[in-house]
Curated annotation (Swiss-Prot):
It comes from Sulfurisphaera tokodaii (strain DSM 16993 / JCM 10545 / NBRC 100140 / 7) (Sulfolobus tokodaii). This is Reverse gyrase 2. It is an enzyme of class 5 (isomerase). The lineage of its organism: Archaea, Thermoproteota, Thermoprotei, Sulfolobales, Sulfolobaceae. Residues 790-1233 form the Topo IA-type catalytic domain. One of its GO terms (cellular component) is cytoplasm. Monomer.
Length: 1233
């Protein structure tokens, strides 16, 4: 890393909260007031020890206490286990020592129970009390035995109490008495015991409570209430929180009130919940305990997906299954499609049982799963349905090795019969999308809302009620009615098949149940002890079309899935040896079983790390954390941390909410930048402070006296990024590694740099993660391939920000004071200063363009009249006002000179860059540049498009494969005739703006509506419009050239029927596109981009001939002039044209185009016309422009602005010294008088 840029951060010293230099933070140190010596520290421990030695500890004193107790804890841990705690355990220990209550959501084998037990012994050594709650009596017994063994190992005397079923009544009373008197160190019992005895036990005094397998503890509301009572919450507290949660949608401040209740009642208590897969959520418990549960749906999978073809008769199927079971060995799950029913499962069990010990699992014999787990059953058979017991209710990583699917998991129903509610919901949504009937769209929304609140078992029950004619729900009955009606329409059926990825065969509708495939195959690949096991899935294909649809759906959900053919006779999977694969899977299971049986964590678990992943946006944080499992959520200060699981990582994802620091407005140096000069040598030191926001939406860095907002003087401050830094520093202390994944541009690099410096004293292992799309694959690549920080990008941003501040503040002050006084004299307004006025290096030349263009427009205006031949409204004729005869309702004559049909080949345009997207969004839909950028930012953060601030047209191989996948989907094997892959550019990290999945807008809308793609925020019609533009432009960029069929009509316009006197017209021809042709017959309406007018399907030439009754090319028609408008030969700017001009003249950058236009509008210098969206300067704008050009033209000239931006680009590339540029700007502003 080259020399770091000088800067100072106010209120940021980790120890005293005063100003600290970037150099000291970079060295992991504190400010010079706290530590005179300027030296480097490699860890927070080293820093704290030095400050302690000098008696200078202040805010960091709490860390000294935590570290001291951490060392004691670790020593105890080592004495018991034989080696120190690993990544996540270190994090859990620190959180306990900070007296935080939290939930551990981690896979089996990461030592959660061990941690809980050792923590209770640690507290016992301090003479504190602990309660441990387990789901079963056998686990209570195991915990008692382990505590006894551990206390003997460590010589910790502990008074251990536990409840077991063998004690008599007098012993029970003695137990209750001891508990209520506090005469114990550790008490262990089952969850059931506490539910039954809560009245006797709710006043127990304790310091630490550990709830093992909290899923069991949350099975019922009574169970959850018991936990809350034990935590100290009363019934009134629970009722209050329920009421507050009802209001939370309208009023987020209720969470502050809940936090107060939590703080008051949990005082002095630390409560830890443990679960492998916390899927049950109790909103009140979550709110009061300060976390939200995650889920078991983990999309990480290390599965070899294989296929073979299902034989046509049952005997051959049985023989194939026997062969597979023999080759693959024990530990298999066999899934039968739900349409074949339990009878088929029982049939297979009977046929296979003569050779293997196999059992069909139903709700009545789930105890057999334990026999299977213990190795007493060879394989299990179950139903391939989303709510099947083997699909959802089994997690045995040491035993399950492979899954066999006897047919594709599917929904299958006869057209007209009662279908599964999940299928009903999907088809209803498709019908709404196809018909555009808002009643159906709303009905589909209500059905989805109902189903999302129901468990799989409840959905199954309602489906059965519908089939038996017992369904009473009016909404669902209406949904069945609508679907059955539309399924009788063959056109609708065809469109549903195209849109919804289903197969219609012999009067049946087949839909692949891809979520069941993911869940069921996922049983073979689980995380255990920091290792993601390898699994094998064998899919026996019974319908090739359905398989193709399944493959497409899985690719959308899993990013990538590779199918290999299983050749059982050749003992091959693809080109790999089947025996080698099975041996590898068996070795993994033996290793896991060894860990499980020995009950200890292997030292190899040291590779498991806690990783803090920091991004800007909460939406992006939520999107990323959802890629791997539904995350658990923690609230720290003003940020939410999403905790999720990777193979060997616990990932904590948190968001900064954009920039954390900005230049101070305090009276330091020149507008917050200190200038140091020694002879000809300069240094520029910007001073940064944390960003704040008041209740009225004003953003600032520095309070007025009395913690007031400097703009509106309120003391109601809703955001202070100091709290963000504090929260991130807490998380940094827990993490083994920190990755900062802010946007891949100069602003993103500066945010990352600021965070890096703020956290460096707390954790030295910090790197930069770069990604250009928010997809699972891209995020994993970024996590696994971090890079150093690019200080050149940081320096470039510093130059931009200082230049913007200096020029902006200097010129703005002139406008607000000097200019405004003069303006008010001329226009009779108050002569006080106007703080809304501003000027900037880029803003000012752009304003000048708008003013000049408006003047040119006015100077070249003329009136134009128009009319058309009766019956052909599409063909309009325009003439200039050139004499008194040309007026409204006057007649003129059109002589058709020639008509012809042309065929032209049009090469596709490249995919979007920022400027071209802004242009088209404004031209096609009238969406402003700033609104388009907000929408594109959302689409990027939600993982739907690549990074949107780019001037590159390059498309990666990944992008090309997305286009290929989509075209193959819609055109089948003929897609090669229309697909022409193009990269549109070479090298570089940035790509053009493109979709991240092969989904057109209708497919995306359907997946979002059905909840198959879960987005971190709701998207609007405008989001879909912009996505549609991006998708069309991208797909078209990968097509062969288009053949465009045009009709051209050439004519003269005259005053008389003989055309002796020709009139001046706008143009003497009209062209119409009547068709677009591709090499194959295809409906291109969903994916083709045309930068042109609409396609006229009916021939204008034919209409002309039919209307006039003549085929004569020399035809003369009399037409009436029906209207007029004023037109100039010079067009006013639209936002689209202004962006194109900025790009052409190299003024501004992709990240600033929208901001510049937005600022000019906000200042009132320009207004936008309502209908035509033209930009018109106001009187104020004209006068500001005149003032700036007269007095400061050299500072706001196009040439100077362009040169400066080029110099900043050179700083980014490391080709220019940023100090030299700042020196030039410094002299420049010094000359402003």
């Amino acid at each position: 890393m080259n020399t770091i840029p000088s800067s100072n951060y106010l209120s940021s010293c980790p120890n005293c909260g005063r100003v600290i230099s970037a150099e000291r933070l970079y060295k992991g140190s504190v400010c010079s007031e706290c530590l005179e010596e300027d030296r480097e520290f490699n860890s927070i421990r080293e820093l704290v020890n030095e400050l302690s030695r000098l008696n200078k500890l202040n805010r960091l004193n709490y860390i000294k206490e935590v570290l001291r107790e951490y060392d004691i804890f670790v020593e105890l841990f080592k004495r018991i286990i034989g080696f120190p705690p690993f990544g996540p355990q270190k994090s859990w220990i620190i959180r306990v020592l900070r007296k935080e209550s939290f939930a551990i959501i981690a896979p089996p084998g990461l030592g959660k129970t061990t941690f809980g037990i050792i923590t209770s012994l640690y507290f016992s050594s301090k003479n504190f009390r602990s309660i441990l709650i387990f789901p079963t009596r056998s686990l209570v017994k195991q915990a008692v035995d382990r505590i006894s063994m551990y206390s003997n190992k460590t010589n910790i005397e502990t008074k251990l109490l536990y409840y077991h079923s063998g004690i008599n009544e007098s012993q029970k009373q003695e137990l209750y008495k001891a508990l209520n008197a506090g005469d114990f160190n550790i008490f262990i019992a089952t969850n059931r015991f506490f539910i039954d005895k809560i009245n006797e036990l709710k006043n127990i005094k304790y310091d630490f409570m550990f709830v093992d397998d909290v899923d069991t503890a949350l099975k019922s509301s009574k169970s959850a209430e018991t936990i809350l009572n034990l935590a100290g919450f009363s019934k009134d507290d629970i009722l209050s929180v329920k009421e507050l949660l009802r209001k939370s949608r309208e009023d987020e401040s209720v969470y502050t009130k809940i936090q107060e209740i939590r703080g008051n009642k949990l005082k002095g208590k630390t409560i830890v919940f443990s679960s492998a897969t916390l899927t049950r959520g109790n909103p009140v418990l979550s709110a009061l305990m300060g976390f939200r549960p995650g889920s078991s749906v983990i999309y990480l999978r290390k599965i070899i997906d294989t296929y073979a073809y299902l034989p046509n008769n049952d005997d051959d199927v049985v023989n194939l299954l026997k062969e597979l079971l023999n080759k693959l060995g024990e530990g298999g799950l066999i899934f039968v499609p739900v349409d074949k029913g339990q009878e088929y499962a029982k049939f297979l069990e009977a046929k296979l049982s003569d050779s293997f010990n196999v059992v069909t699992i139903t709700s009545s014999n789930t105890n057999k799963i334990e026999d299977f787990a213990n190795g007493n059953i060879y394989a299990l058979i179950g139903s391939a349905t989303h709510y099947g017991i083997l699909v959802r209710g089994i997690d045995i990583p040491w035993r399950v090795k492979y899954a066999i699917f006897v047919g594709i998991p599917k929904f299958k129903f006869k057209i007209g019969e009662v279908m599964n509610l999940v299928a009903l919901s999907r088809i209803l949504s498709m019908i709404g999308l196809i018909t555009k009937d808002q009643d159906i769209v709303r009905l589909a929304g209500r059905v989805r809302g109902k189903l999302r609140k129901l468990s799989p078992a409840a959905i199954s029950m309602l489906t059965n009620q519908a089939r038996e004619g017992k369904l009473e729900d009016e909404t669902l009955l209406r949904a069945y009615e609508v679907v059955n009606k539309y399924l009788e329409d063959k056109d609708i059926l065809k469109k549903i098949a195209e849109l919804g990825d289903l197969v219609i065969s012999n009067g049946y509708i087949l839909m692949p149940d891809y979520l069941t495939y993911i869940q069921a195959s996922g049983r073979t690949s689980r995380i255990y002890g920091g290792e993601l096991t390898t699994g094998l899935s064998v899919l026996l294909i019974d319908d090739i079309n359905l398989f193709n649809i399944l493959n497409r759906k899985l690719s959308l959900i899993l990013d990538e899935i590779i199918w290999q053919e299983l050749q059982i006779k050749k003992n091959k999977i693809g080109s790999s040896d089947l025996t080698e694969i099975i041996n590898k899977i068996n070795e993994e299971r033996e290793r896991i079983l060894k860990v499980k049986k020995e009950g200890e964590i292997e030292p190899s678990l040291q590779k498991v790390k806690t990783v803090l992943f920091i991004v800007e946006s909460p939406n992006k944080a939520k999107t990323i954390s959802n890629f791997f499992a539904k995350p658990s959520i923690r609230q720290l200060e003003n940020i939410r941390a999403f905790e999720t699981v990777l193979e060997d990582k616990i990932l904590i994802v948190a968001a900064t909410g954009g920039h954390v620091y900005d230049l101070t407005t305090q009276n330091i140096g020149i507008y917050g930048v200190e200038v140091q000069q020694q002879n000809s040598h300069f240094n520029f030191i910007p001073y940064y402070n944390t960003i704040k926001k008041c209740i009225n939406g004003h953003q600032f860095t520095d309070f007025e006296q009395g913690n007031q907002c400097p703009k509106c003087h309120t003391t109601q401050i809703i955001l202070d990024k100091t709290a963000t830094i504090d929260a991130l520093r807490k998380l940094a202390l827990e993490a083994d590694e920190i990755l900062i994944g802010t946007d891949p541009d100069t602003e993103g690099e500066k945010i990352a740099w600021d965070i890096y410096l703020a956290l460096k004293p707390f954790n030295s292992n910090i790197k930069r993660a770069e990604f250009h799309e928010v997809t699972r694959k891209a995020i994993l690549q970024a996590i696994n391939n971090p890079r150093p920080f690019n200080v050149n990008l940081v320096k470039s941003q510093i130059v931009r920000r200082i230049e913007d501040r200096w020029i902006g503040f200097k010129l703005s002050t002139k406008l607000q004071e000097d200019f405004w006084k003069e303006y008010c004299k001329n226009y009779n307004c108050k002569s006080e200063e106007n703080k809304n006025l501003s000027a900037g290096r880029v803003q000012s030349p752009v304003l000048n363009w708008i003013v000049n263009r408006y003047d040119e427009y006015n100077a070249n205006k003329t009136k134009i009249y128009y009319g058309s031949i009766k019956g052909i409204d599409e063909l309009k004729f325009y003439v200039f006002k050139q004499n008194e005869k040309i007026r409204k309702n006057a007649n003129i004559y059109v002589k058709i000179i020639n008509t012809k049909v042309l065929e032209e080949e049009i090469n596709p345009l490249p995919p979007y860059t920022t400027d071209t997207l802004l242009y088209d969004a404004n031209q096609f839909y009238g969406i402003s540049a700033s609104e388009t950028m907000k929408i594109a930012q959302d689409l990027f953060e939600l993982g739907l498009i690549t990074y949107h601030r780019t001037d590159s047209t390059r498309i990666s191989n990944t992008g090309i494969s997305i286009a290929e996948g989509y075209l193959k989907q819609i055109a089948g094997e003929n897609y090669t005739k229309i697909f022409k892959p193009r990269s549109w550019g070479e090298g570089g990290a940035h790509e053009a703006i493109r979709p991240t999945r092969p989904l057109d807008v209708d497919q995306l809308r359907l997946l979002v509506d059905e909840g198959e793609i879960e987005l971190a925020k709701k998207i609007t019609r405008a989001h879909f419009l912009i996505y549609d533009l991006i998708f069309r432009r991208f797909i078209t960029s990968q097509l062969v050239p288009l053949k465009v069929i045009k009709e051209r009509i050439e004519y003269k316009i005259c005053e008389d029927s003989n055309c002796n006197s020709e009139l001046k017209t706008l143009q003497n021809y009209s062209e119409f596109i009547t068709d677009i042709k591709l090499p194959i017959q295809l409906d291109y309406s969903k994916f083709l981009y045309l930068p042109t007018t609409r396609i006229i399907k009916n021939s204008i030439i034919k209409k002309l001939q039919e209307t006039t009754g003549s085929t004569n090319a020399e035809l003369v028609s009399k037409i009436q002039l029906t209207g007029s408008f004023v037109k100039s030969t010079v067009n006013l700017y639209t936002q689209a044209e202004l962006v194109a001009e900025m790009k052409r003249k190299e003024i501004g950058r992709p990240s600033t185009y929208a901001t510049i236009i937005s600022t000019i509008l906000k200042r009132g210098y320009v207004i936008e016309s309502k209908k035509t969206k033209k930009l018109i300067p106001t009187q104020l704008g004209k006068e500001v422009n005149k003032y700036l050009n007269q007095k400061f033209s050299s500072f706001v000239s196009e040439e100077r602005t362009r040169n400066l931006l080029q110099l900043m680009d050179m700083v980014e590339q490391g080709k220019q010294d940023y100090i030299q540029i700042l020196k030039d700007i410094y002299y420049e502003i010094k000359s402003i008088r």
